């Protein structure tokens, strides 16, 4: 548990993986951003929602985990 009884937030790459697995398919950056923010899976350090740019940057840093194909992010299997 996090502070004041709130569950601990996922890291952004964990939140992306969670969304991809739960949806059972690849998703676009805007779709991932929407799901992560709707479910409050990850928040920025300032408490604001995640941006498309952050999701894109996370994909780019984790290309060993994710693959970009036709505008869609997939898990590497």
Where are the language model's segments positioned?
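Short helix-capping/hinge SLiMs at alpha-helix to coil transitions
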Residues: 21-25
């Amino acid at each position: 548990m996090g502070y004041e009884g709130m569950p601990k937030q996922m890291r952004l790459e964990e939140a992306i993986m969670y969304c991809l697995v739960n949806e059972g398919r690849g998703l676009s950056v805007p779709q991932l951003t929407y799901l992560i923010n709707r479910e409050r899976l990850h928040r920025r350090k300032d408490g604001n929602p995640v941006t498309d740019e952050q999701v894109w940057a996370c994909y780019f840093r984790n290309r060993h985990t994710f693959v970009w194909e036709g505008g869609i992010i997939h898990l590497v299997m």
